């Protein structure tokens, strides 16, 4: 026969991941084992037994909410993208310059730092 006077010890972790020893004590009134740190929770209502209709409706409600959120995110993503079109170069800008092949003089490229290019070394 089990000795209900000696508590059952177990390892528990707190929010800071520190491990300590907890103990289960026998509750003569409820005929169950409760953690010693749960004293005062006599009015605790346990989770009800599995009810397939409730869980199914909760699942369908959750699924509906997830679909709704996904639609909202899609709508937010499809906002006005005109501000980004300036980042895409025009087709004319993508064409290579064939000035030398056509016989035209090649254009001088602008220097990135005009002030620095004006100081020529002697």
Swiss-Prot record:
Q: Where are the transmembrane segments?
A: none
Q: Does the keyword NAD apply?
A: no
Residue segments, region Disordered? 1-27, 73-122
- What is the recorded post-translational modification? Acetylated.
**Keywords for this protein:** Acetylation, DNA-binding, Host-virus interaction, Inhibition of host innate immune response by virus, Inhibition of host IRF3 by virus, Inhibition of host RLR pathway by virus, Late protein, Viral immunoevasion, Viral release from host cell, Virion
Principal location: virion
> Which domain of life does the UniProt lineage start with?
Viruses
Q: Where in the cell is it found?
A: Virion
What family does this belong to? Belongs to the asfivirus structural protein p14.5 family.
Q: What does this protein do?
A: Structural protein required for transport of intracellular particles from the assembly sites to the plasma membrane. Binds to both ssDNA and dsDNA. Suppressed the activation of the cGAS/STING pathway by interfering with the recruitment of IRF3 to TBK1, which in turn suppresses IRF3 phosphorylation, decreasing interferon production.
Q: How does it assemble?
A: Interacts with the major capsid protein. Interacts with host IRF3; this interaction interferes with the recruitment of IRF3 to TBK1.
What protein name applies here?
Answer: Structural protein p14.5
Name the species this protein comes from: African swine fever virus (isolate Warthog/Namibia/Wart80/1980)
Lineage, opening ranks: Viruses, Varidnaviria, Bamfordvirae, Nucleocytoviricota, Pokkesviricetes
């Amino acid at each position: 026969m089990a000795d209900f006077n000696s508590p059952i010890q177990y390892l528990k972790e707190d929010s800071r991941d520190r491990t300590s020893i907890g103990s289960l004590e026998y509750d003569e009134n409820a005929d169950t084992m409760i953690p010693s740190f749960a004293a005062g929770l006599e009015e605790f209502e346990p989770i009800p037994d599995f009810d397939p209709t409730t869980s199914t409706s909760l699942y369908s409600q959750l699924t509906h909410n997830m679909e709704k959120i996904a639609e909202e995110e899609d709508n937010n993503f499809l906002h006005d993208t005109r501000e980004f079109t300036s980042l895409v170069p025009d087709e004319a800008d993508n064409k290579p310059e064939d000035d030398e092949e056509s016989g035209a003089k090649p254009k001088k490229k602008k220097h990135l730092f005009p002030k620095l290019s004006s100081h020529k070394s002697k």
